[in-house]
Amino acid sequence: VADKPVDHLRPRNARFIGPLSRMDPARAIMPDKNYRIVCVISGPEPQRSILERELMRLLPAIPGEHLIVRGMPGPVPDERRGHVRSIGHLADDALTGALLGADLIVGRTGYSTVMDLERIGRTALLVPTPGQPEQEYLGRLHKDNGRFIVQVQGELDIAAALESRVAGTRIPTTRDSGERQLDVAMKELAGLLPGRCSGT
């Protein structure tokens, strides 16, 4: 069922290992000056560019320094329009620092984005990529549970998102990263294998 959780499909011997994320708050590189709004754009064209243009239309009217991470591979020159800076990409630790210091984060509703936000304990304004069923599903799910602010591309109201009580909240982080929990699970699994020899 499209709008129902899939807990009933989970095998009895399965375990959740938490979010698998490239981000680690302990390694975050904080920017010299925090940005008020940090937007991380992703997704296929032309939807990526459509969202970028919408953000560039809206952000100049909002006070503060803002950053758009355009999610474009290869060398992309930095651009600045007034108090809005656009860059092609950021290294993981620098991106983590920028997100941690922001008053508002804007991104897609992709699984990796949701897991990254869970890992660093931040909520965000999420914008599902039109035509991608999994992102539209996650958008409905998180809009209903109130964990994130969810708006439709083409109808963004960033000022309202900034004023929302959700925007500045922190969400509980997992005690361990998904990688560490996965490592523990794999070691336990290895111990259950028949004929396992020590030292192999």
Model-found features: residue ranges?
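A short, active-site helix/loop in glycosyltransferases that binds the activated sugar's phosphate group
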Residues: 1-12
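A short helix->loop->beta-strand "cap" motif at the edges of active sites that frequently abuts
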Residues: 12, 64, 122
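Donor-nucleotide binding loops and adjacent catalytic segments primarily
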Residues: 18-104
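Nucleotide-sugar donor-binding patch of glycosyltransferase catalytic domains
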Residues: 86-89, 123-168
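Short acidic active-site motifs
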Residues: 93-94, 113, 157, 181
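A donor-sugar binding/catalytic signature common to diverse glycosyltransferases
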Residues: 95-137
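C-terminal amphipathic helix plus adjacent low-complexity
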Residues: 159-200
